[in-house]
Amino acid sequence: QHSTDYDEEEEDRAKLHLDAR
């Protein structure tokens, strides 16, 4: 279990991309 700012940002970006679709 490892959570880093980068990981969180990546998830946020992925969500944004899905929303953009």
Swiss-Prot record:
Broad class of where this protein is predominantly found: secreted
What do the Gene Ontology cellular component annotations say? extracellular region
Q: Which gene encodes it?
A: FGB
Describe the task this protein carries out. Answer: Cleaved by the protease thrombin to yield monomers which, together with fibrinogen alpha (FGA) and fibrinogen gamma (FGG), polymerize to form an insoluble fibrin matrix. Fibrin has a major function in hemostasis as one of the primary components of blood clots. In addition, functions during the early stages of wound repair to stabilize the lesion and guide cell migration during re-epithelialization. Was originally thought to be essential for platelet aggregation, based on in vitro studies using anticoagulated blood.
Q: Where is this region: Disordered?
A: 1-21
Q: How does it assemble?
A: Heterohexamer; disulfide linked. Contains 2 sets of 3 non-identical chains (alpha, beta and gamma). The 2 heterotrimers are in head to head conformation with the N-termini in a small central domain.
Q: Spell out the protein name for this chain.
A: Fibrinogen beta chain
Q: Where is the composition biased (Acidic residues)?
A: 1-11
Localization, per the record, is: Secreted
Where do glycans attach?
Answer: 4
About its domains, the entry says: A long coiled coil structure formed by 3 polypeptide chains connects the central nodule to the C-terminal domains (distal nodules). The long C-terminal ends of the alpha chains fold back, contributing a fourth strand to the coiled coil structure.
